[in-house]
Amino acid sequence: MPDYSAQPKKIFLYDNLELVKYYPYYKRTLPWYQDPTLCRQVDNREEPYDLARLKRMYRFLSTNGECYYIKFRDHGRWHLVGDISLCRGAVSIVICREYQNRGIGRRAISGILRRAGELGWRQVKAEIYSFNDQSRKAFLAAGFRQTGKETFVYGF
């Protein structure tokens, strides 16, 4: 099992994109998970998260793997626009709706794959609902291949 205690505080990806080690910032992240459309993309249900559920999710991801915020520079200012995690052989990602369809997800996925390689992972899985076309496209563009109806795998 990888040693997650050595998780870097930042992973620089591009001049306008970096991954930042998770820290509690629910004022920013709770609105993402209260968006019914985004909840459907993530969990296939439109039920928004409450604060307790959000805390449980982040606690699980950050103690069983590596969890990062996706930080994007837009018009000269840095913004947290989503999160991405490596946990139990899989990657998961959320981009808030106002920053979707800008290539941020694809680039963040490529960056987290580099991190998985550093950790010695041989493959990374992603479960993506069949209706989530934009996420499927991002994972395929990052080099994943579809191995099941909703299963995608990246091999090193």
Region annotations inferred by a language model:
Residues 1-56:
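A short, well-structured alpha-helix characteristic of acyl/acetyltransferase catalytic modules
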Residues 46-66, 73-74:
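Active-site rim helix/loop that mediates acceptor-substrate recognition in acyltransferases
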Residues 69, 77-90:
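Conserved beta-strand in the GNAT
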Residues 71, 90-102, 128-129:
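A short, internal acetyl-CoA/4′-phosphopantetheine-binding micro-motif in the GNAT/acyltransferase core
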Residues 83-87, 100, 138, 151:
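Long, contiguous binding/interaction regions
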Residues 89, 127-128, 145-156:
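Conserved catalytic-core motifs of GNAT/GCN5-like acyltransferases
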Residues 101-115, 136-141:
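Conserved acetyl-CoA-binding loop-helix of GNAT-fold acetyltransferases
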Residues 126-137:
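Conserved beta-strand-loop-alpha-helix junction that forms the acyl-donor binding cleft
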